[in-house]
């Protein structure tokens, strides 16, 4: 049997008074998801193990069945893989947002919806004027710092010999909060450090890494304020992309491919606009399919993603489709948009995939070949909180001939009564691979 996972990032939520105590999933018009839940089996899944941040890098890796205690190295290395940066043993790669600060507070984690073409100009500017800053070079050595352009506001910072034992604060978890108390700090892990270590690019201590990152943050604000892009934004009274914000870093991970973990998977593909998910896919040995017009926002090319998934299922036996839009709506606190993204996912992506799977000869060429569909979010991104929440998420599993349970619609409340009950982490993939 072939398998497709369709993941609506941050799609789950909490009850909202404005919706008479319903969640966006309960309120949204999503007949295909409800049909799959009614005809399939449902449950809830713990996607964030104790002690880990409730981020997409954690939850999506766990959903694919990996042991986070063995493979987790943060977002940075995964996004490096997607961008095509080959990490060395001494590299420390960390996600680097370009964000908006106003009046001493974090206003947006996305630099005022910074576009990739503008971001590329700013990243080049930072490489020329910040990575080569005389004070940085004098203190930490030449070639220590490199910025790498990603997509929109999501970029990468690589520090040769950086130390991962630091405490960072994701900017999307702290909207409207003062930024200075959120600067990087070291974990309480230290070791002796000397000039010879610096010259051979051995690892900095946690304290030195934190100090370097904080210095880069402060200097970036001075530089970005002077850039013509932000000066024009200021004239128009628009939000500026006026600070870098590094978070979630690590070293090069060691991961088995999905095919090594699950022998029944012979080949697979991942479809996502997000570097992080593409990076997980690369380490998992999945083929990366990039869809034109896939933005990671509500205006993404749902139909293009659906068609790409249908084509992938003709040749691969595992497809992972990730849609970011509902997460961004949650971070923006936009209830109406979050509901729309759920409905778009249902009608513009899941519906055509379901119709292709159930159409005779469209995907499956023989009567004994079937496709199993799973739908779930990775975590909650409640619109009233605007941050990630690591509570259990609802999931459904459907295929022709599955024995349905009593769940009648797909949402956080209904799936509590699903026949799978409450699963933990890798148990989801185990359940999926039973078919």
Segments and roles (model prediction):
Residues 1-435:
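Feature captures the catalytic ectodomains and active-site-proximal regions of enzymes
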């Amino acid at each position: 049997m072939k398998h497709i996972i369709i993941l609506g990032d941050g799609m789950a939520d909490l009850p909202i008074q404005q919706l008479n105590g319903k969640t966006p999933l309960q309120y949204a018009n999503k007949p295909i998801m409800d049909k799959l839940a009614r005809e399939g089996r449902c449950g809830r899944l713990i996607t964030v193990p104790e002690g880990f941040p409730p981020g997409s890098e954690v939850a999506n890796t766990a959903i694919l069945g990996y042991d986070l205690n063995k493979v987790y190295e943060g977002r940075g290395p995964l996004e490096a893989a997607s961008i095509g940066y080959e990490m060395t043993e001494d590299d420390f790669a960390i996600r680097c947002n370009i964000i908006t600060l106003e009046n001493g507070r974090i206003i947006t984690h996305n630099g005022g919806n910074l576009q990739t073409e503008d971001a590329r100009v700013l990243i080049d500017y930072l490489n020329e004027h910040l990575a080569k800053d005389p004070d940085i070079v004098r203190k930490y050595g030449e070639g220590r710092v490199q910025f790498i352009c990603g997509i929109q506001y999501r970029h990468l910072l690589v520090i040769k010999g950086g130390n991962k034992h630091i405490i960072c604060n994701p900017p999307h978890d702290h909207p409207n909060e003062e930024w200075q108390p959120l600067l990087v700090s070291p974990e309480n892990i230290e070791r002796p450090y000397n000039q010879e270590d610096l010259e051979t690019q051995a690892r900095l201590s946690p304290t030195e890494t934190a100090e370097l990152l904080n210095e880069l943050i402060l200097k970036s604000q001075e530089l970005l304020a002077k850039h013509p892009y932000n000066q024009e934004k200021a004239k128009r009274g628009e939000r500026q992309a006026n600070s870098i914000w590094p978070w979630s870093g690590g070293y090069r991970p060691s991961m088995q491919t999905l095919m090594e973990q699950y022998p029944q998977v012979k080949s697979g593909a991942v479809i996502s606009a997000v570097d992080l998910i593409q990076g997980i896919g690369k380490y998992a040995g999945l083929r990366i399919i990039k869809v034109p017009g896939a933005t990671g926002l509500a205006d993404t090319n749902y139909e293009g993603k659906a068609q790409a998934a249908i084509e992938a299922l003709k040749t691969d036996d595992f497809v992972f489709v990730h849609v970011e839009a509902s997460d961004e709506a949650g971070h923006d606190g936009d209830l109406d948009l979050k509901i729309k993204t759920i409905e778009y996912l249902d009608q513009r992506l899941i519906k055509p995939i379901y119709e292709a799977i159930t159409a005779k000869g469209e995907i499956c060429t023989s009567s004994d070949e079937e496709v199993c569909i799973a739908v779930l979010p990775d975590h909650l991104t409640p619109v009233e909180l605007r941050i990630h929440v690591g509570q259990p998420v609802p999931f459904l599993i459907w295929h022709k001939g599955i024995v349905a349970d009593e769940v009648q619609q797909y949402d956080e409340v209904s799936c509590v009564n699903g026949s799978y009950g409450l699963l933990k982490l890798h148990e989801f993939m185990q359940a999926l691979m039973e078919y």
